[in-house]
């Protein structure tokens, strides 16, 4: 084998090893992102670190109406986890989007439908709630008591 071929082979292997350490984004999160974009005018990234509950985790009292949307969504996912075999992070669902209308199409009383309803309700709530840029990236230790 030529030295140049060996270098290319090593480079490809190293690249693949690096890519293997990047976790895939949960499919449900992608669906939720698409619902947010369907229902509203703000990009989904506007909600990533908003208030005390928009984003990963949450604590304290929601700072405003929009943060309450995230609080309610978190609680909805907590309820979904009580359904046997229902994992909000990986379970996908079916819905239609005719901007700004969202319709969940899975059979009622299933995990998929429950999760879709959680995401649909949150996306509609986000679209109607006022957005206060002062509540982005707030200190949870100071503002989320």
UniProtKB/Swiss-Prot annotation:
Q: Which PROSITE patterns match?
A: PA2_ASP, PA2_HIS
Q: List the disulfide bonds.
A: 38-97, 52-144, 54-70, 69-125, 76-118, 86-111, 104-116
Any single GO BP term: arachidonate secretion
Q: Which UniProt keywords apply?
A: Blood coagulation cascade inhibiting toxin, Calcium, Disulfide bond, Hemostasis impairing toxin, Hydrolase, Lipid degradation, Lipid metabolism, Metal-binding, Neurotoxin, Presynaptic neurotoxin, Secreted, Signal, Toxin
Matching CDD domains, A to Z? PLA2c
What GO cellular component entries does it have?
Answer: extracellular region
One Pfam family name is: Phospholip_A2_1
Maturation propeptide residues = 20-27
Where does this protein reside within or beyond the cell? Secreted
Q: How does it assemble?
A: Monomer.
Could you tell me which PANTHER family the record lists for this protein? PHOSPHOLIPASE A2, PHOSPHOLIPASE A2 FAMILY MEMBER
Q: What does this protein do?
A: Snake venom phospholipase A2 (PLA2) that shows anticoagulant and neurotoxic activities. PLA2 catalyzes the calcium-dependent hydrolysis of the 2-acyl groups in 3-sn-phosphoglycerides.
Q: Which family does it belong to?
A: Belongs to the phospholipase A2 family. Group I subfamily. D49 sub-subfamily.
Query: What protein is this chain from?
Result: Basic phospholipase A2 KPA2
Provide the organism lineage as a comma list.
Answer: Eukaryota, Metazoa, Chordata, Craniata, Vertebrata
């Amino acid at each position: 084998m030529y030295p140049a071929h060996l270098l290319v082979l090593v480079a490809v292997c190293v690249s693949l090893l690096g890519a293997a350490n990047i976790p895939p984004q949960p499919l449900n999160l992608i669906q939720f992102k698409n619902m947010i974009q369907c229902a509203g005018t703000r990009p989904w990234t506007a909600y990533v670190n908003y208030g005390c509950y928009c984003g990963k985790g949450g604590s304290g009292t929601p700072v405003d109406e929009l943060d309450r949307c995230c609080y309610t969504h978190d609680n909805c996912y907590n309820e979904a986890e009580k359904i046997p075999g229902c994992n909000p992070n990986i379970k996908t669902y079916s819905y239609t989007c005719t901007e700004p209308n969202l319709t969940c199409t899975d059979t009622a009383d299933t995990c998929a439908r429950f999760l879709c309803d959680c995401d649909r309700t949150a996306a509609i709530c986000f679209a109607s709630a006022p957005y206060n840029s002062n509540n982005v990236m707030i200190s949870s230790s100071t503002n989320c008591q």
